[in-house]
Each structure stands twice: as C-alpha cells, then as structure tokens.
C-alpha cells in the first residue's frame, strides 16, 4: 500500500447531483477541475490501480441545508464490498441533538472508523458545549472525529458564499474540544487555512489533534505547514486528497517534490493513518 487517502467523498451522482446540486459548480471553479462521476465499483478500481486505501466519508447537513444526506449505510456497504480498498467514516448532524448521539452506536455497528463533521455546512460551532455529549460518546466508542476546518471550496466565489459561514470552521473552535476530551482523536481537515498557524500551535500543544492535508495541491501548501509536517508534527499529519475535487495521484506526485525525508513521508502517507484507523 502506497498511501491512505484520509479524505474521499463519494463521486456518485446521488451525492454530486442531488445533495451537492448547485455547490459543485462553485467547487469546480475553486479547484479548477472537472468533477467526474463514478460508481462505487469504478472508484474502487481507480484506487486499487494506484495501490491507495480510501477513507470514504458520509455526509449529513440536513438541518442547515435541507439537502439529503449521504447515509452511513451507503459508506458501510462500500467498505464491506471492498474491504482491502475502503475504510469509512460516518456522519451525523449535530443539530439533531439526541438523535445524532444515538446514531454513533449505529456507526460503530456498521464497522465505520470515525465521524465526519462540516461545521460550515452544518452551521454549528464545535466549541458550543451543547455538543459535548456527542464528543463524549465518540470518545467512549473510540471514534475519531474529522472536522472540516478553514475556508471552503463550496460556495467560493459566489455571492454571499452561498450562505456558508467560514467562522464556524475556525480551527481554534476545536481547541476546547481536544482539551475536554483528551482521549478523542480530533482531525482537522485542510490544515485550517487561512488560520493554519493557529492550528499548528494547537497541534503542538495537544497531541490528540491531527491535521489532514487534503483540499490543496501539495505544491501550494504554505511553507509553515510543510515545515512542521517534516519536523515537530510528523506524527500528527495524515495524507488526504479531497477526491473527487483533487486527484490522489496528483497529490502523491507533488509530495515527492517537497523534499520530505522518506521516513517522514512514510508516517504521513501510511503510519499515522493506520494508527487512527486502528489497523495493523
């Protein structure tokens, strides 16, 4: 296995053309790429061809957006059908309260490894203590939490950003979460840009904060992020692409040009991800 891609959205028409309808066009412009629709089997074949494991992400922002979710069961089914190629994270809508907390047990029973949350799209502030029961149950169940942080390709370049607020996704909002739940692995996606220095300081302070580098072509990742990934935080970074918006092969190719020592690259591409997923 060459890598674990920790940030893979389903490229199926059900998600892209229904749940994400109207968002995709802005995202394509932001990423300067055309999003290609693929079936689950085609996606598995694509990742098998490059010898990369994909962590598939469910999605639930029904309360804030009114859009249909990507069910946890869909991700779990893909993982069962392609166990050597896929692992999965479920999703819950924090605004659903007790229902969301109860759904966490279902996520575990489905064999999923963590939970994906998108504060900007779900319109919630992660440091609001109303959501403490959700984090507490994740900690009890051993579920990692992957938060979208920083700016968003969804809504980018549109009037009002299509109503999406970036302040929800400030990395500092995860600091209180990581402090209150020290056994909870908190993964900050997209390294929190433009607040990446804030996130780097948090990760240096709290070893249960991890950072994924998805959503950016590696050659554009800020130098401060690369420096800490090579150095003090090499055990807390994980590889990710943000597929289908960015192709994993491009990310792997560009990482080679960043002068990252092979032992460090092994950690970022594989070892740290394995530890978070609990796989040998």
Give each language-model segment a name.
Residues 7, 75, 88, 107, ...:
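Conserved, mostly hydrophobic/aromatic
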Residues 11-14, 61-64, 94-98, 151-155, ...:
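Active-site environment of divalent metal-dependent phosphoester hydrolases
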Residues 53, 61-156, 165:
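Active-site gating/metal-coordination segments in enzymes
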Residues 113-114, 127-238:
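Catalytic pocket-lining loop regions of alpha/beta-barrel enzymes
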């Amino acid at each position: 296995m060459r890598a674990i891609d920790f940030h893979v959205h389903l490229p199926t028409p059900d998600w892209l053309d229904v749940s994400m309808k109207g968002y995709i066009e802005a995202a394509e412009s932001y990423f300067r790429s055309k999003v290609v629709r693929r079936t689950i089997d085609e996606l598995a074949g694509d990742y098998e061809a490059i010898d990369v494991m994909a962590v598939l992400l469910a999605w639930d922002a029904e309360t804030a957006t009114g859009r249909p979710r990507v069910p946890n069961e869909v991700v779990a089914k893909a993982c069962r059908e392609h166990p050597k190629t896929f692992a999965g994270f479920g999703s819950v809508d924090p605004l659903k309260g007790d229902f969301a907390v109860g759904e966490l047990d279902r996520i575990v029973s489905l064999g999923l490894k963590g939970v994906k949350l998108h504060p900007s799209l779900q319109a919630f502030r992660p440091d609001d203590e109303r959501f403490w029961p959700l984090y507490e149950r994740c900690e009890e169940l051993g579920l990692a939490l992957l938060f979208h942080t920083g700016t968003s390709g969804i809504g980018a370049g549109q009037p009002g950003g299509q109503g999406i607020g970036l302040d929800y996704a400030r990395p500092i909002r995860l600091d209180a979460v990581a402090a209150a739940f020290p056994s909870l692995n908190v993964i900050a996606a997209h390294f929190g840009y433009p607040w990446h220095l804030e996130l780097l300081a948090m990760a240096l302070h709290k070893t249960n904060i991890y950072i994924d580098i998805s959503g950016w072509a590696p050659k554009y990742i800020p130098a401060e992020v690369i420096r800490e990934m090579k150095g003090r935080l090499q055990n807390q970074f994980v590889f990710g692409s943000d597929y289908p918006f960015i192709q994993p092969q491009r990310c792997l190719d560009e990482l080679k040009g960043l002068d990252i020592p092979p032992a460090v690259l092994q950690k970022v591409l594989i070892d740290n991800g394995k530890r978070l997923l609990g796989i040998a």
